[in-house]
Structures are given as structure tokens and as C-alpha cells.
Design a protein with these regions (language model features):
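Active-site phosphate/ATP/adenylate-binding loop shared across adenylate-forming ligases
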Residues: 4-236
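Phosphate/ribose-recognition catalytic cores of enzymes acting on nucleotide-derived substrates
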Residues: 1
């Protein structure tokens, strides 16, 4: 569990339960997202702040991970169709490295349609990280290679560099927009961005205004009612 209501707990999950959750998250959530935002829907990909990392294993070899990671792993074959981050990025354990690379591939995608994370606090972490690192990220887009300071396996880095390719025009555009300031930056660098998919409300609502500073009040949509224990429902 995430530990938002106390200490983290281990909840056993069967393959049947994984398939059930994956079916709803992979099929119904996009459908209801379309219903809510069809005026600007482009069928574009999104930036998803998640991973498919197995944290550890039991003595018997059963993998232990967050519910989100397990769910993402179960739909691994279609992840590249839904999200801008390559599979290799979702397999990185280090949080800062992961955020950097999630952003790098999202910044290359001028038609990004949505940003998604489990909790809105993660969205804010991402946007603050963008504020601190946008100059390095733009340089990487210009050169088509990942900054030397990003510590990742050399073979993984080689694979990702092949996917980047230099894009001076995109780098010039990003430099121009960031020079205007960070307020509303998301809507300016991703003009087709139409919603933020994440859990907010209640205790999380304190993050809304901080996120809105960067997004210029792009709608925040909580698509599902879910817990580690199981899928509860969809928010149409």
C-alpha cells in the first residue's frame, strides 16, 4: 500500500485481480476521459509518472511492489501506445533519474495530451523538478543525447539516445517559452494538453493551487476510485 493512511501493508494480489484492474484502467478510464474532454481530444499520448519496478521479493520468490507498478507491468505491451516514456524509463529505480527521463521524452512530444500520476503531490514534484532542470533538458533535446550527469546503465542510455535524435527546432521553441517564466508553462509548451489525471481532493487539495500555477488551471480529473486492496469504481 502507499501508506497514506498509516504504515505500508502487504496485500496479496492474484493474477485474476490484476487482469480485472488492468481491464478497467486500460479501457474504461480512457473512454471516460474522452467523454469528459472530447472537445480537445486528440488521441495523443500522455506523460505517466509511474514505473514497473519490482521493489523486492519474498523468500519464496513472489515479487513485492506498489499496486501501481504491478498494474502497469500487467499492461506492459501497450504502454508505449499510451505514454511518451519508453519502457526502459519505467524500469529505472532512482527517482530523480526517472523524473528527468520522463520529462525529457515528454518535452519532445509537442502533442502531449495529458499528464498522469497516482497522487497530485507527484504532479507537483514533477513540475518543480522541471523548473529546476529545464535548461539541461532542453540541451539534451537539442543535441539528441542524455546529459552526462544522468546516471543510468550505459546500455540503457545507448537505447534511449537512439530514440531521442537532435531536434533544434523544438529546443528553440522550448527556450523561448521558458524565457517567459514558469507560470502557465505547461499549456504553452504543450498546447494540446487538456487534462491532468490524478487523485486530489480532501487532504490532497492543498496541492491544487500550486499545480495550477504551472498548468494555468488545466482541469484536474480523478478517473478512478481505487485502492491497493482492489478496484472500487470509475469516475465518469
Amino acid at each position: 500500500t502507499s501508506g497514506t493512511t498509516g504504515s505500508q501493508k502487504l496485500i496479496p494480489v492474484t493474477k485474476k485481480a490484476q487482469k480485472f484492474a488492468a481491464k478497467y484502467m486500460a479501457l474504461l478510464v480512457p473512454k471516460f476521459s474522452y467523454n469528459n474532454f472530447k472537445y480537445g481530444y486528440t488521441y495523443g499520448r500522455g506523460l505517466m509518472i509511474s514505473d514497473i519496478v519490482m521493489t523486492t521479493y519474498t523468500k519464496g520468490g513472489t515479487p513485492i511492489c506498489s499496486a501501481t507498478s504491478g498494474g502497469m507491468k500487467s499492461i506492459k505491451p501497450i504502454l508505449s501506445l499510451m505514454y511518451t516514456s519508453p519502457i526502459e524509463v519505467m524500469e529505472i529505480k532512482d527517482r530523480e533519474t526517472s523524473l528527468y527521463l520522463h520529462l525529457l521524452f515528454a518535452l519532445k512530444e509537442k502533442n502531449l495530451m495529458y499528464i498522469s500520476a497516482v497522487f497530485i503531490s507527484s504532479i507537483l514534484d514533477l513540475l518543480r523538478f522541471l523548473e529546476d532542470n529545464y535548461k539541461k533538458l532542453i540541451k539534451d533535446i537539442r543535441t539528441g543525447s542524455i546529459n552526462y550527469s544522468v546516471k543510468i546503465d550505459s546500455k540503457v542510455k545507448e537505447k534511449l539516445n537512439k530514440l531521442l535524435k537532435p531536434d533544434a527546432a523544438r529546443a528553440d521553441f522550448l527556450e523561448k517559452e521558458f524565457s517567459k517564466g514558469l507560470q502557465g508553462i505547461c499549456k504553452r509548451i504543450w498546447p494540446k494538453l487538456i487534462y491532468i489525471a490524478t487523485v486530489t481532493g480532501a487532504n490532497f487539495s492543498v496541492y491544487d493551487d500550486k499545480v495550477n500555477y504551472y498548468t494555468d488551471y488545466i482541469p484536474i480529473y480523478s478517473p478512478a476510485y481505487a485502492a491497493t486492496e482492489g478496484m472500487i469504481g470509475i469516475n465518469p
